[in-house]
Amino acid sequence: MGNVFRCYVEKKPGFAVEAEHLFGELRHTLGLTGLTGVRVLRRYDVEGVDAAVYAAARTTVLSEPQVDDLWDEVMPAPEGEHTLLAVEALPGQYDQRADSCAQCIQMMHGGERPTVRAATVYVLEGTLTAQEAAKARGYLINPVESREAALDKPATLRQDYPVPAAVPVLEGFTALDRAGLEGVLAQYALAMDLADLAFLQAYFRDEEGRDPTLTEVRVVDT
């Protein structure tokens, strides 16, 4: 179940209220007179379920067949001049749409919760200059919570974060003599003087019973 399934969902003509409203805003509020139409599609990437579960979810959780058109993997190529823009939540930003879909799919099949990533794809039909396209992007992307999404499907939705490097410990610090402490001051270019470093040494030796990390020394030194 390592496959990523992708689908695009768009309201059928007569139900595309959001697209019609957005067209009016972009054309009249932003003055994009070259804009001739707007399409709004929801894009879903799903990982962690098998093909049978996905097939059931695509028409029960991800779309409503009565009012939605749905395409698997790729959306129909837009005709004529157009600008394509995909927008997704920033990493770490709560995405209610994706989370709700993941919960519903989990309840539907009774297994582990899948990973769902959602994005909104805008098709801006008509001829837009580079400046007008940038204006539309600025209007559609709130940088506090969203960003422009890649158009290609990822191989996986898993996000691997690098393991932070271990914080170095100043081994033997609490046993250093005066010359050793002077060496620490020079090696790490510390701003504190010898008396301050000796006080820090006594604290870690007598109160903490251990050698400090370099980070702890840097914090005291600032």
Model-identified regions with their sequence ranges:
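Core nucleic-acid recognition elements
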Residues: 1-222
